[in-house]
C-alpha cells in the first residue's frame, strides 16, 4: 500500500472533492429510488411490448451496477476526511485490488451502451416482423439482454488483457494508467455507438410512418405500426438523452486523457470528475422511462377518444341519412 503524494492528499481533502462526493451521493440515491419506481411501473400492464420492457429493466440494472461501483469513490472521500486519523498518509489503492470494482464499473458503462443497441434491434424486429414479434412476447428481449450481458461482463477483462496492473491510484473508479490506450479506444467506440443509435432509431421512425400511411385501411397492421411508432419514438428520446450524456463523457474524458500531460494534476482531477457523465445518464434513465410510459399512456387515451368520437359522428351521419330516406 502506497501513500498519496502531497498533491493527491490535497485532492483528497479539497472542498471540491467533498462537494462532488456529496453531489454523487444524491445522484446515487436518486438512481436507486427512481429505478425502483420505474421497475414498478414497467411491471404493470402497459402499452410497452414485453420484449422492450425486459430491455428497459436491463438498462436500469446496468445503470445501478455502475452507480454502486462508482459510489466507492465518494465513500472513500468521506472516509479519509472524517475517519482518517493518520493525516501524514492517505492510502492509495492497488489497481489489482480494484479489479472487482472496476469490472462492475466497466460492465455498467458498456452495458448501458450495448443495451441501446439491443433496443434499436428490438424496434427493428418490431418494424420488419410485427406479427411474429407480437407473438414472441418477451423472448426477443431476453435473448438480446443475454447477448448484451456477456460482452458487458468481460469488457474490463478485454481492456486489461496482457497488461500488468502494478500501479496505485486514489480511487477504484479511476482506471490504471497502464491501460490508457485501450481505455481511449473503448471511449472512441462508445462515441461511435451513440451516434449510430440515434441514426438507426430515426430511420426506424421514418420507416414506421411510411408503413402507417400505406396500411391506412388495414386496421390490425395500422394498430401494430402505430404502437410500434410510439414506442420507437420513446426509445429514440431515451437514446438522445443517453447520447448527450455519453457523448459528453466519451468526448470530454477522451480529450482530457489525451492531454493529461499538459494539465496540472490538481486541476485535472477536480475537473475530470465533472466531465465523467455516466452518473448523469444513470440518474436520468429512470425519470425518462417514467415520462415515456406516462406519455405513451396519454397518447393512447387521446387516440381512443378520437376513434370513439369519429365512430359517434359516423353513426349520427348514418341515422340522418336514414331519416332523410324515409321522408
From Swiss-Prot:
Where on the tree of life does the source sit, at the highest rank? Eukaryota
Its Gene Ontology molecular function terms?
Answer: G protein-coupled receptor activity; olfactory receptor activity
Q: Which PANTHER family match?
A: SERPENTINE RECEPTOR CLASS ALPHA-10, SERPENTINE RECEPTOR CLASS ALPHA-12
Compartments where found: Membrane
Q: How does it sit in the membrane?
A: Multi-pass membrane protein
* Family the entry assigns: Belongs to the nematode receptor-like protein sra family.
> Extracellular side of the membrane: what ranges?
1-18, 75-98, 160-185, 256-270
**A Pfam short name:** 7TM_GPCR_Sra
Residue spans crossing the bilayer: 19-39, 54-74, 99-119, 139-159, 186-206, 235-255, 271-291
Provide the Gene Ontology terms for cellular component: membrane
Sorted alphabetically, the Gene Ontology BP terms of this entry are: detection of chemical stimulus involved in sensory perception
- Residues on Cytoplasmic side: 40-53, 120-138, 207-234, 292-327
Q: Which residues form the signal peptide?
A: none
Protein's UniProt name:
Serpentine receptor class alpha-12
Q: Which organism is it from?
A: Caenorhabditis elegans
Tissue note: Expressed in neurons RIF/RIG and PVT.
Quick check: keyword Manganese in the entry? no
Q: Which UniProt keywords apply?
A: Membrane, Transmembrane, Transmembrane helix
State the disulfide connectivity. Answer: none
Amino acid at each position: 500500500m502506497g501513500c498519496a503524494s502531497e498533491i493527491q492528499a490535497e485532492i483528497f481533502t479539497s472542498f471540491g472533492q467533498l462537494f462532488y462526493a456529496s453531489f454523487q451521493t444524491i445522484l446515487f440515491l436518486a438512481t436507486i429510488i427512481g429505478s425502483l419506481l420505474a421497475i414498478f411501473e414497467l411491471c404493470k400492464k402497459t402499452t410497452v411490448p414485453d420484449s422492450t420492457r425486459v430491455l428497459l429493466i436491463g438498462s436500469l440494472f446496468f445503470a445501478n451496477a455502475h452507480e454502486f461501483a462508482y459510489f466507492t469513490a465518494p465513500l472513500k472521500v468521506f472516509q479519509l476526511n472524517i475517519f482518517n486519523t493518520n493525516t501524514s498518509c492517505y492510502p492509495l489503492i492497488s489497481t489489482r485490488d480494484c479489479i472487482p470494482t472496476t469490472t462492475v464499473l466497466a460492465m455498467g458503462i458498456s452495458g448501458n451502451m450495448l443495451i441501446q443497441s439491443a433496443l434499436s434491434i428490438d424496434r427493428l424486429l418490431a418494424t420488419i416482423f410485427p406479427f411474429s414479434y407480437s407473438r414472441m412476447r418477451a423472448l426477443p428481449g431476453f435473448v438480446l439482454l443475454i447477448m448484451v450481458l456477456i460482452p458487458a461482463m468481460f469488457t474490463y477483462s478485454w481492456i486489461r488483457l496482457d497488461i500488468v496492473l502494478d500501479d496505485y491510484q486514489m480511487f477504484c473508479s479511476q482506471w490504471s494508467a497502464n491501460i490508457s490506450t485501450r481505455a481511449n479506444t473503448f471511449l472512441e467506440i462508445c462515441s461511435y455507438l451513440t451516434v449510430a443509435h440515434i441514426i438507426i432509431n430515426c430511420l426506424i421512425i421514418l420507416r414506421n410512418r411510411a408503413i402507417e400511411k400505406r396500411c391506412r385501411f388495414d386496421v390490425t397492421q395500422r394498430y401494430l405500426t402505430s404502437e410500434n411508432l410510439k414506442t420507437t419514438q420513446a426509445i429514440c428520446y431515451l437514446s438522445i438523452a443517453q447520447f448527450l450524456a455519453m457523448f459528453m463523457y466519451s468526448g470530454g474524458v477522451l480529450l482530457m486523457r489525451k492531454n493529461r500531460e499538459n494539465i496540472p494534476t490538481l486541476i485535472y482531477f477536480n475537473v475530470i470528475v465533472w466531465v465523467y457523465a455516466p452518473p448523469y445518464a444513470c440518474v436520468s434513465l429512470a425519470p425518462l422511462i417514467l415520462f415515456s410510459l406516462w406519455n405513451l399512456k396519454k397518447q393512447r387515451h387521446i387516440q381512443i377518444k378520437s376513434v370513439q368520437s369519429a365512430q359517434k359522428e359516423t353513426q349520427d351521419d348514418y341515422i340522418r341519412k336514414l331519416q332523410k330516406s324515409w321522408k
